[in-house]
């Protein structure tokens, strides 16, 4: 796989370097109407695709955007819910992870369809469809979601640095600001370099969990049985709460904006036939990538079930707690190191996608373009401050509550991304011949309904939890 990716990168590197060099001169350009120009203009159609030859080479040309999107499905919020679900209920909630992954596959396929059919990302499509006031509101809640996601990345990276190197959480949070240099270097080298970096770290995460699962040796029959839905998930209030958390933490709202934009980086023919072919390959790319995300999220829960639940550790909810228990329970010190390494790779990976998502949202809604380094500094700065304040006031234990708050904020924003997406892909004026078929829209609206109901329930439970905490 790595050989094929390297060949694909070498194939179009000259085109990428030319475009990325010109992009480095861009600054704030509020006068350039984004709705009249392509999303991420400097990277638009910058990746050459093969129109002939073996299907495998054509698929390789489209591999990348789906894996960048999949990063959002493995953030520390997913880690926390997976650890809690596995330690408390064993393998029972694997069915919820599978269901939420199917939902994500459908929604990301629709986001890719919008980008390929309309040559607009979701933010641009919203700007063309809604009033100025509505667009400002959508932009504001989306920016809040991106900051919340970045907050989870700061916490995850800081915790990983603390576990691996003993770096204090506050210092680790400050160190994460340096990642702006990494983002700039990668963006300067072109979009294929970004994708290669993300995929490489995903392979690191994958490898870490493969080793940990082998060491944990979970019973295969129980693991497979966990993917079968059970009534107990709904009947048990605690299981239902964790199930809602898993679904709410899985579909990331900014991923819909991101995916609708970065699928347009491929230089496919902008013709009806070319768009239809590009859509097939883009959906294949995102489906394969989200299956990798399914494996990693399931691995977190399986690891917690095999290591903690089996040893009667039923209340493992903090990432630090899981790290401290892994080595003694498994009897292998490297298991905990691999766990923290995977967490660090996840946090670094999210840096790239969060920067792109922020740029896409700002350009699409406001017609405002900032240099990537300035955009990154603003977002990361707003994410670091709450971490420093919470740790200073409540100690390192407060990061767990802050992580939960970030997931609640993401849940609040989700309907404001899903519903506009579904309305756009069902509009023939926007989509043309690639308008979503009726059966697909029925499925998509059912998924949207489930997500909205579950997120409302999650928010209600969180509000009750806060009120109980205040009364105590």
Curated annotation (Swiss-Prot):
Annotated Pfam families: Nramp
GO terms of biological process kind: iron ion transmembrane transport
Keywords: Cell inner membrane, Cell membrane, Ion transport, Membrane, Symport, Transmembrane, Transmembrane helix, Transport
Transmembrane as UniProt keyword: yes
Signal peptide region: none
The keyword Secreted is assigned to this record: no
Membrane topology annotation: Multi-pass membrane protein
Protein name: Divalent metal cation transporter MntH
Organism: Xylella fastidiosa (strain Temecula1 / ATCC 700964)
Top-level taxonomy: Bacteria, Pseudomonadati, Pseudomonadota, Gammaproteobacteria, Lysobacterales
């Amino acid at each position: 796989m790595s050989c094929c990716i390297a060949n694909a990168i070498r194939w179009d590197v000259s085109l990428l370097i030319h475009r990325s060099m010109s992009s480095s001169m861009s600054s704030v350009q509020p006068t350039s109407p984004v709705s009249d120009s392509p999303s991420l203009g400097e990277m638009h159609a910058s990746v050459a695709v093969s129109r002939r030859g073996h299907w495998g080479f054509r698929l390789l040309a489209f591999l990348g955007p789906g894996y960048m999107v999949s990063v959002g499905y493995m953030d520390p919020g997913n880690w926390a819910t997976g650890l809690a679900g596995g330690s408390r209920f064993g393998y029972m909630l694997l069915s919820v992870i599978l269901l939420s992954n199917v939902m994500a596959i459908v929604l990301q396929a629709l986001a890719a369809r919008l980008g390929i059919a309309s040559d607009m990302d979701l933010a641009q499509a919203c700007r063309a469809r809604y009033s100025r006031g509505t667009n400002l509101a959508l932009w504001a809640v989306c920016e809040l979601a991106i900051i919340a996601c970045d907050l989870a990345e700061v916490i995850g990276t800081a915790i990983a640095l603390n576990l691996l190197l003993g770096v204090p959480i506050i210092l680790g949070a400050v160190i994460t600001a340096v990642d702006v240099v990494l983002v700039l270097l990668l963006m300067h080298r072109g979009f294929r370099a970004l994708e290669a970096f993300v995929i490489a770290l995903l392979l690191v995460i994958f490898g870490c969990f493969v080793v940990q699962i082998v060491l944990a040796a979970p019973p295969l029959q129980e693991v497979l049985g966990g993917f079968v839905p059970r009534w107990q998930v709904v009947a048990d209030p605690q299981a239902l709460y964790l199930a809602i958390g898993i679904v709410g933490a899985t579909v990331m709202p900014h991923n819909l904006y991101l995916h609708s934009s970065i699928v347009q980086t491929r230089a496919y023919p902008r013709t009806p036939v070319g768009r239809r072919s590009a859509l097939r390959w883009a959906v294949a790319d995102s489906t394969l990538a989200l299956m990798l995300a399914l494996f990693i999220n399931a691995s977190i829960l399986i690891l917690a079930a095999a290591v903690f639940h089996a040893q009667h550790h039923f209340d493992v909810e903090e990432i630090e707690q899981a790290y401290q228990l892994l080595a003694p329970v498994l009897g292998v010190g490297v298991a905990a190191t691999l766990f923290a390494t995977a967490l660090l790779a996840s946090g670094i990976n999210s840096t790239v996608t969060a920067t792109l998502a922020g740029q896409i949202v700002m350009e699409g809604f406001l017609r405002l373009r900032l240099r990537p380094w300035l955009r990154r500094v603003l977002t990361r700065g707003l994410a670091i401050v709450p971490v420093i304040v919470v740790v200073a006031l409540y100690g390192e234990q407060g990061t767990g509550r802050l992580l939960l708050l970030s997931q609640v904020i993401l849940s609040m924003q989700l309907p404001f991304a899903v519903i506009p997406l579904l309305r756009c892909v069902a509009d023939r004026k926007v989509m043309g011949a690639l308008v979503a078929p009726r059966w697909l829209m029925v499925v998509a609206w059912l998924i949207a309904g489930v997500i909205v109901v579950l997120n409302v329930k999650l928010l209600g439970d969180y509000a009750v939890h806060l009120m109980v905490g205040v009364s105590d």
